[in-house]
Amino acid sequence: MSAETGELIWRDRADSHPSATITGAPALNGNILYVPVSSLEVALAVNPAYECCTGRGSVVAYDTRSGDRLWQTFTIPDAPTLQSVNAAGTNMYGPSGSMVWNSPTIDHTRNQLFIGTGENMSSPADHSSDAIFAIDLTTGKVNWIYQALANDAWNTACGTNTPQSCPEEDGPDFDFGAGTLMVKTDSGRQLVVAGQKSGIVHALEPKTGKLVWKNRVGRGGIQGGVHFGMAAGNGKIYVPISDGPDGREYDTPDRPGLHALNADTGEILWYSPAPNVCAGRDFCDPGVSQAISVISGKVFAGAMDGVMRAHDADTGKVIYQIDTTKPFTSISGEMATGGSFGGGSGAVAKNGLVVISSGYGIYAHMPGNMLMMLSVE
């Protein structure tokens, strides 16, 4: 659309599958727009009569001037085929899934982009799920794939009273929901860093996809672990961990809060545990699910308890916090209330101001609807 008038210039449906959607922000590189494709089909499998699943993740490249589609690269090269019939007599298709929930990261040096993928949605699980892809910017050719976790096939039928379409692998649903980071370490090395819902952070060599280091930072879970986005700066990787309750039992302890890692080695430099201030409130949990931001030496981390905390980037100490679940008088004179911080958009800074958005009333979190502007002074 025209930024000045709103006039439509061109439009295109990125994927023809009826459940396809776009959850990650597209990435712009010159006159080419790279659009990640995900899907809501994972939720339909709870119905035993639904033929699960036929959607695949992809990236679509567009010429921004004309809207011409330059290429589309699927995370699963071949369309799903009939695999079995479930206990309800419904056809089951696969491999499927490996959706791209996050925004592509551009690697100008090597003319490629990076994406992370989700789980397979039906059996059989394949090599494309819970993986990092490097894709050529010009041709869409896959340069390499790093799979962090094999045999992860899961959908919303799993763990319900209608499990007929749950894949035989049955999870654990440890996507890469958060976007990757291109990081330059203190030693001058470039790394691709990715945080997973398992709570593990992976650092890869960008040319080959070879693992350089990995570290378990959180317990992990269906909503993380690392859910929506990390940040980096001054040789550190800042990792938000949610580790909220999800009905499962785990061998590792919960570590909700904010962690700082040495980008060269993956060593944990500091950990700021998330305080539990929920006091029994419904849908309130400690932990950080929302994407975080590094602004002027501070790490802004909005938590699931509705509190935005600014941490000292060197020490992790909380130097400012504001509870957005309390009522505020808006500029229109109406009362506004926030809720849990969630989703892929963290704090945004401009001209000495920080903009935050509070309220995330899905997946058993606190609803709210408030846009707030803060001063960084």
Label each PLM-derived region with a short phrase.
Residues 1-20, 29-31, 42, 46-95, ...:
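Extracytoplasmic/lumenal domain signature
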Residues 25:
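Long, structured ligand/cofactor-binding scaffold of large enzymes
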